From Swiss-Prot:
Name of the gene this protein is made from: ecpC
Miscellaneous remark of the record: Not expressed under classical laboratory conditions, but is functional when constitutively expressed.
Signal peptide range: 1-29
Function: Part of the ecpRABCDE operon, which encodes the E.coli common pilus (ECP). ECP is found in both commensal and pathogenic strains and plays a dual role in early-stage biofilm development and host cell recognition.
Induction of expression: Negatively regulated by H-NS. Positively regulated by IHF and EcpR.
One Pfam family named in its UniProt record: CooC_C
Keyword Transport among UniProt keywords: yes
Family: Belongs to the EcpC/MatD family.
Protein name: Probable outer membrane usher protein EcpC
InterPro entries, A to Z: CarboxyPept-like_regulatory (IPR008969), Pilus_assem_C (IPR031917), Pilus_assem_E-set-like_dom (IPR032636)
Keyword Coiled coil carried by entry: no
Keywords attached to this entry: Fimbrium biogenesis, Signal, Transport
Length: 841
């Protein structure tokens, strides 16, 4: 039976006919044209509507619940009357994260309904635990379920970010400049410099990456190097890359340690994609709570309340993102209408993991191409010439319970290589990592590490060991070293103590040993700042040479308003030095940090070293670049000066802007049109960024969704009305540069007194400007907001006559008193009031 829309007349008849739905059947009173269904008399008009077919809402109802206040709409049903038999034509389910979910069996039964008839009680049984009940009086359909028919609303562990918000060609260029000068003791000097450039040009999700550097700029030894030239498309959970790649762009899943330096021209394809976001912050074992009605779920650990969350009726997974990491038990309390309905203990399993996280699907990449191997040398003993070779391989990673693993198999230069990496947490206190490599030329490598947090939480311990043996083909060196270290937090034993750290490194291949021991204690912390004590010793021995020992002790004083001061002594190279350091930080301005240090030998033989050394530095954050300037005079007499600066440029069409930030290779250009030093703020995913002047560029991380809101700056006296373009939602891929062009009006609150040309006051007059209106008081005084672009006030009188006040607001900010102003074009206010005219706005 085809479905038709109700005509207005039929809707009226239907509404009128609904009155009769509540009339109990009575043979003596029933209309001969009425029909009875399920004990309800159906008027002729409503019967006709049912024959045409109609949609009714579908609600889920928990069996045994009183009332319908906790019912949730989960879809709609199309019902129709066929030869006196009421049927369901089909069910349309509506998915919602907040709604209860039905079991898969119940869902399949619902979706399979096609022209299913209701019985005399207007019910359709689905399973032993679920049935459909139709109420003609309320004109709604209920899915009545027992708890066994409910599914569980689980939280998504992955999500695609979707299509790019930027549909035109755009580009981001990041730059990093470094200049170094070394002044020698004999008066000579040498200077070196570099400029690194990374450009990403994109069209929607497609982008091309160029990465290279210039060296020795301005010198006779200028050189350049191109490191990457790559096309990439990472979309909907799959990534393709091709061109001149580095090993990270070729594959990023498993270890790949046997590849030597060189250039790779190849392709890569797989599902290791940044366009799919995996949430590894949830518990690997879901924490589930059942609520018979809308209520709260409380999570408690050792008597401490960790979380309170609200849910509707049904089985729900509790959000564990905000819970501490580790493996532990929590008490789950379900509270409905202020009463504890249930209480039980569940296990939380949250562990730090590499890659996608526990429970993510298998990740894979296949890759290959041509490999140009650079010339290789090992301490002048082994040398291998540059060589061309093929390269092909595959990588994969995944997890099994708490075990995370990754594997890579590849071949080049007629050699086959296999590598694996395993990470296994043992409880919440021990973490084991193993990485192995095996090649067909008998090369092998094994790296293992164990880290542990000892009971009580006051100490930790770590152990690392690496052993590598290389055959006659791979371009790597042997290795044999081990390290052990730990940290002891004595503060947990006694509040007056601090933290003690120790480490030992042993490189058995080169017969070198390195010991360190450090102690830090907070001596004072209060209103006037904090005082800390640092002390330590280091001892280094390389081969048969004499051991080199260094010692230090220092007091660090941190003062309010970003001030820091340190004083101490160090002993190294056979003499003792006194050291002073100071630092000042600024929240605003171009210079953000300035610092200086001074050292003087106070005992021992300095030999050829100078007795006095020191340096100074400044960190800056300007509109188009940020970086550091450092000048240092070392004990050996050399004076070293270096400058580093970095920034970004964004481009889209006719829009181009620069920034001193390098947060990512995507971004947003804001064309605010603000004059002079006007300032507003952009709130992006909760973070506040200042916007100054007419145009700003803000680099952002790629593969992200952003909610952007423009607002007035709390650091500015100016007030702005952001008429349009206040809020935006963006999805950015590498190289995407979005352009936001809001309509911004700079507002000034103007107050003053308005007069006619003869000096008479315009009392109780309605005056207007570009954005609003107001009325003067009996003294001709007024207060109104004015758009600085249109600094005029006008007054209309005698029908179509107008006088106008031109305001001088170029230097005005926030609020201004303009004093007496003249409305040019009005000779006298008295003439207006004598005519008795009602002045108009």
């Amino acid at each position: 039976m085809p479905l038709r829309r109700f005509s207005p007349g039929l809707k009226a008849q239907f509404a009128f006919g609904m009155v009769f739905l509540f009339v109990q059947p009575d043979a003596s009173a029933a209309d001969i044209s009425a029909q009875q269904i399920g004990g309800v008399i159906i008027p002729q008009a409503f019967s006709q509507a049912l024959q045409d077919g109609m949609s009714v809402p579908l609600y889920i109802h928990l069996a045994g619940s009183q009332g319908r206040q906790d019912d949730q709409r989960i879809g709609s049903a199309f019902i129709w009357l066929d030869d006196g038999q009421l049927r369901i034509r089909k069910i349309q389910l509506e998915e919602s994260e907040d709604n209860a979910s039905v079991s898969e069996q119940t869902r399949q039964q619902l979706m399979a309904l096609a022209n299913a008839p209701f019985n005399e009680a207007l019910t359709i049984p689905l399973t032993d635990n679920a049935q459909l009940d139709l109420s003609l009086r309320q004109l709604l359909l209920q899915l009545v379920v027992k708890r066994e028919a409910l599914g569980t609303v689980l939280r998504s562990r992955s999500e695609d970010i979707g299509q790019s918000s930027v549909n035109t060609l755009s580009s981001n260029l990041s730059y990093n400049l470094g200049v170094y000068n070394n002044q020698l003791r004999n008066g000579g000097s040498n200077t070196s410099s570099y400029l690194s450039l990374n450009n990403v040009t994109a069209l929607r999700e497609h982008h091309v990456v160029l990465d290279g550097s210039l060296y020795g700029i301005g010198s006779g030894q200028q050189d350049s190097e191109l490191y990457k030239a790559m096309y990439e498309r990472d979309f909907a959970g799959h990534r393709f890359a091709g061109g001149m790649l580095d090993t990270w762009n070729l594959q990023s899943l498993g270890p790949m340690t046997a590849i030597s330096a060189g250039k790779i021209y190849g392709l890569s394809w797989g599902n290791q994609a940044s366009s799919t976001i995996f949430d590894s912050s949830q518990s690997a074992t879901p924490v589930i709570a059942f609520l018979p009605a809308a209520g709260e779920v409380h999570l408690t650990r050792d008597g401490r309340l960790l979380s309170v969350q609200n849910f509707t009726m049904g089985n729900h997974e509790v959000d564990t993102r905000g819970l501490p990491y580790g493996i532990y038990d929590v008490e789950v309390e379900v509270i409905v209408n202020g009463r504890v309905i249930s209480k039980r203990t569940q296990r939380v399993n949250k562990l730090f993991s590499r890659g996608r996280g526990v429970g993510a699907p298998l990740a894979w990449q296949v890759w290959g191409g041509s490999f140009h191997m650079d010339r290789w040398s090992e301490n002048g003993k082994k040398t291998r010439p540059a060589k061309e070779s093929w390269l092909a391989g595959a990588s994969t990673s995944g997890s099994l319970s708490t075990l995370s693993w990754a594997a890579t198999g590849y071949g080049y230069d007629n050699q086959a290589v296999g590598e694996t990496r395993l990470t296994l947490p043992l409880g919440g206190a021990i973490n084991v990592n193993l990485q192995n490599m095996l090649a067909s030329d008998s090369s092998w490598s094994s790296i293992g590490s164990i880290s542990a947090t000892l009971p009580g939480g006051f100490s930790s311990l770590w152990v690392n060991q690496e052993k590598t043996r290389i055959g006659n083909q791979l371009r790597r060196s042997d290795a044999d070293n081990r390290a052990i270290g730990g940290t002891l937090n004595l503060n947990s034993l006694w509040s007056k103590l601090g933290t003690f750290s120790i480490s030992y490194n042993d490189d058995r291949r080169y017969n070198s040993h390195y010991y360190t021991a450090d102690y830090y204690q907070n001596v004072y912390s209060g209103t006037f700042g904090s005082l800390g004590l640092r002390a330590g010793i280091q001892r280094y021995n390389n081969g048969d040479s004499n051991a080199n020992t260094g010692k230090y002790i220092a007091l660090d004083l941190s003062l309010p308003l970003g001030n820091w001061f340190s004083a101490g002594m160090t002993h190294q190279n056979g003499y003792t030095m006194a050291n002073l350091s100071a630092r000042k930080q600024f929240d605003e301005g171009t210079i953000r940090t300035v610092g200086a240090n001074l050292s003087r030998a106070i005992s021992g033989d300095t030999g050829d070293d100078k007795t006095l050394s020191g340096g100074a530095y400044a960190q800056f954050d300007a509109r188009y670049a940020s970086g550091t300037l450092n000048v240092n005079s070392a004990a050996d007499g050399y004076v070293n000066t270096n400058l580093t600066a970095n920034g970004s440029v964004g481009w889209q069409g006719k829009n181009i802007a620069a920034s001193g930030r390098t947060d990512g290779n995507a971004g947003v250009i804001f064309n605010t049109g603000l004059e002079d030093d006007g300032q507003i703020s952009a709130k992006i995913n909760g973070r506040i960024f200042p916007l100054n002047g007419k145009r700003n560029y803000l680099p952002l991380s790629p593969y992200g969704r952003y909610e952007v809101e423009l607002q007035n700056s709390k650091n500015s006296l100016d007030s702005y009305d952001i008429v349009s373009g206040r809020k935006s939602r963006l999805t950015l891929y590498p190289g995407n540069v979005a352009v936001i062009e809001p309509e911004v009006k700079q507002m000034v609150t103007v107050s003053g007194r308005i007069r006619a040309e003869d000096g008479t006051l315009l009392a109780n007059a309605r005056i207007n400007n570009h954005i609003g209106r107001t009325r003067t008081d009996e003294n001709g005084e007024f207060v109104m907001d004015v758009d600085k672009k249109y600094p005029t006030i006008d007054f209309r009188y005698s029908g179509n006559k107008t006088c106008e006040v031109a305001l001088e607001l170029n230097q005005a900010r926030g609020a201004v008193w303009v004093g007496d102003v003249v409305c040019s074009g009005l000779s006298s206010w008295a003439a207006v009031t004598q005519t008795g005219e009602e002045n108009e706005s």
